[in-house]
Amino acid sequence: MVMTDPIADLLTRVRNANAVKHEVVEVPSSNVKKAITNILLQEGYIKNIEEYNDGVVPMLRISLKYGANNERVITGIKRISKPGLRVYCKKDEVPKVLNGLGVAVISTSKGLVVDREARKDGLGGEVLCYVW
């Protein structure tokens, strides 16, 4: 079956694994997925990313992060711009997620960045997802 939205698939797998408190989740790898997971790693939402090849498709193994009392670090994760309805923002309209408690991942001309960096660098682009 052809996947129409691989980014939504990544976010859904992470959301579902996080909901049942799995330690790791595996997703097929792509450059955009690697960039999104690297942002999640830098922002402290996940523990580790490992890329491996199972012979057919390169995969990403994402280690999820939990707090001291096993509480979830990722409270919510939401796809914003979808293949059927793209969502863009200008440099002056970069969204804030929960007044700065979460991050928006934005695809800009400089690559994927979080909302803070887009505001600082004066960049707009496609709003891929919110994580909080």
From Swiss-Prot:
Pfam families: Ribosomal_S8. This is Small ribosomal subunit protein uS8. HAMAP family: Ribosomal_uS8_B (MF_01302_B). It comes from Clostridium botulinum (strain Eklund 17B / Type B). The keyword Ribosomal protein applies. One of the primary rRNA binding proteins, it binds directly to 16S rRNA central domain where it helps coordinate assembly of the platform of the 30S subunit. The keyword Ligase does not apply. Keywords: Ribonucleoprotein, Ribosomal protein, RNA-binding, rRNA-binding. GO terms for biological process: translation. GO terms for cellular component: ribonucleoprotein complex; ribosome. Gene3D superfamilies: 3.30.1370.30, 3.30.1490.10. GO terms for molecular function: rRNA binding; structural constituent of ribosome. Part of the 30S ribosomal subunit. Contacts proteins S5 and S12. Belongs to the universal ribosomal protein uS8 family.
